[in-house]
């Protein structure tokens, strides 16, 4: 006896039933739209633009980097303002340089409370970029880190590294 679903009842019980993906077609979850707001025009912005440039072309428009002329404590407010204007960017981030930030814990708390992800750089942001060259040296002083990274960058790329 055949059932209304087109197969014998024994077929469904024997594990021959189509799973949900087969019945509905393959559904691939959509990658979210990210908004990264930073207060530095140089290093952090360049890092994220390089990251965006390395992803497939069809995904590049899902990662927006905005540099805001704002104090670090105002970045959460700026991120929320931009999300309000461009609602497709549902995953807001603030990224800032950890050096000399007053109220660090409060900034993180405010971001979390408002649904904004927070990221901050090592006192020498260039330490992150060392990872692209397969290294992660232990350098304590920011100025030493920058100088050593500039040397490494020039050796690998043949170009001078400038930090303003």
Where is each model-derived feature located?
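Short, basic/hydrophobic alpha-helical segments
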Residues: 74-88
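Phosphate/oxyanion-binding active-site loops and adjacent basic polyanion-contact surfaces
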Residues: 40-44, 68-76
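C-terminal accessory helical subdomains adjacent to catalytic cores in phosphodiester-
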Residues: 1-33, 45, 49-66, 84-93, ...
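Acidic di-acidic motifs
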Residues: 39-40, 95
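Conserved beta-strand elements of the Class I
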Residues: 35-37
């Amino acid at each position: 006896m055949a059932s209304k679903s087109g197969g014998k009842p024994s077929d469904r019980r024997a594990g021959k039933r189509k799973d949900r993906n087969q019945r509905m077609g393959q559904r691939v979850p959509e990658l979210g739209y990210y908004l990264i707001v930073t207060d530095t025009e140089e290093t952090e912005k360049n890092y994220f633009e390089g990251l965006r440039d390395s992803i497939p072309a069809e995904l590049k428009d899902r990662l927006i980097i905005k540099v805001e002329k704002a104090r670090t404590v105002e970045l959460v407010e700026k991120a929320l303002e931009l999300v309000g204007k461009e609602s497709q960017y549902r995953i807001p981030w603030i990224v800032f340089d950890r050096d000399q930030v007053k109220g660090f814990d409060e900034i993180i708390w405010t971001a979390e409370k408002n649904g904004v992800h927070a990221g901050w750089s090592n006192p020498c942001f260039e330490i992150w970029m060392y990872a692209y060259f397969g290294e992660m040296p232990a350098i304590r002083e920011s100025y030493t880190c920058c100088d050593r990274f500039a040397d490494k960058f020039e050796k690998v790329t043949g170009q001078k590294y400038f930090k303003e």
